[in-house]
Amino acid sequence: MRNFIIHILTGLSGSGKSTALDVFEDAGFYCVDNMPVALLPKFLEIPVNTASGISGLAFVMDLREPDFLATYPSVFNDLKAQGYRLTVLFFEAGENVLIQRYSQTRRHHPLAGDKGLVSGIRRERELLEELRASSDTVIDTSTLTIHELKIRLLARIRKSADHMPMRIHVMSFGYKYGIPHDADIIMDVRFLPNPYFVDPLKHKNGTDADVAAHVLNHSTGSAFLEKFLNLIDFLLPLYKNEPKAYLTVAVGCTGGCHRSVAVATAVFNHMKKREERHVEISHRDLKEAGQTT
C-alpha cells in the first residue's frame, strides 16, 4: 500500500474527527475509525489492487485506545522510514466549544471519569500536546461549520492526492415513470423531435445512431446540445469546489427511450473527452419501455 496516501486523523475528542473521516470516505478513501496503532503496519501489508478506485487511506486514532500514546511514535516513524506517505492531521477546538458540543450530543468524554467533563478535556489536551506539536497540520474547528470543514479538508486532499475525483452519473429517464430523486441537474428534452412517431425509429432507442441523428442533427437539436454542454462545462468545476463527492445529471423525455437517451449519451461522451475518469451512464427506463441497449 505504499502507493496510497495515508492520513492519520487524531486530536481532541469532540473536535470533528468523525466528521472529517466522512469527508475522506466520500472522497474515495478507505477509512477506519478507532484503528489500533499497533495493527497499522500489518494492515498496510494487505495487497490492494491499485485499480480498485481507492484514492487513499484514512484512519482515526486517539486516546480511546489505551496504548495510543506509548505506541504511535515508533509506529509512525517506522512507516515513514519504510517509504509510506503518512501525514498526521490534528483536530482541536476551544474548551467552551467542546463543552457545548458534549452538552448537545450528551456523549461521554473518554477521560471524564469521576472528575467531570472539563477535567477530561483539559487532561486530554495535556496528554496530546506532544503529538499536536509533531503533527503535519493542526485544524481548529472552533469556528468552522461542517460545510467549511469539508471545504478545507477537500482542498487539502486535492492538493496532496494523485486525484480526488468527483463521481459523475449521467442518466436518462422517462417522465411517465417519475423524476429521479437523487438528481442534481435535471434537463427536460421533450421539446426535441420525437423519433417515436417515425416508423423506422419507433422500436429503436437513443443509443442507435439513426435515432441520435434524428434527435440532434438539426438546428434545434445541435444548438441545444452545444448550449447544454457549455453549461455542463461551466458547472463541473463549481460543483467540484462546492465540495461535492457525487453529481447526477439526469436527462428526461416522455418515455425515456429516444430523446433522453440520445442526449444523455452525448453528455457522457463529452465528459469522457474532457478526461473525466469517474463518469458512468445509465438508462433507467429502457427496460420499462421494453427496450434494450
UniProtKB/Swiss-Prot annotation:
Positions annotated to bind ATP: 11-18
Keywords: ATP-binding, GTP-binding, Nucleotide-binding
Domain of life: Bacteria
InterPro entries linked: P-loop_NTPase (IPR027417), RapZ-like (IPR005337), RapZ-like_N (IPR053930), RapZ_C (IPR053931)
UniProt GO molecular function: ATP binding; GTP binding
Statement: the UniProt record of this protein carries the keyword ATP-binding: yes
Positions that bind GTP: 62-65
NCBIfam families per the UniProt record, alphabetical: PRK05416.1
Alphabetical list of HAMAP family matching this protein: RapZ_like
Similarity-based family: Belongs to the RapZ-like family.
Job of this protein: Displays ATPase and GTPase activities.
Record's protein name: Nucleotide-binding protein Dole_0503
Organism: Desulfosudis oleivorans (strain DSM 6200 / JCM 39069 / Hxd3) (Desulfococcus oleovorans)
Upper lineage: Bacteria, Pseudomonadati, Thermodesulfobacteriota, Desulfobacteria, Desulfobacterales
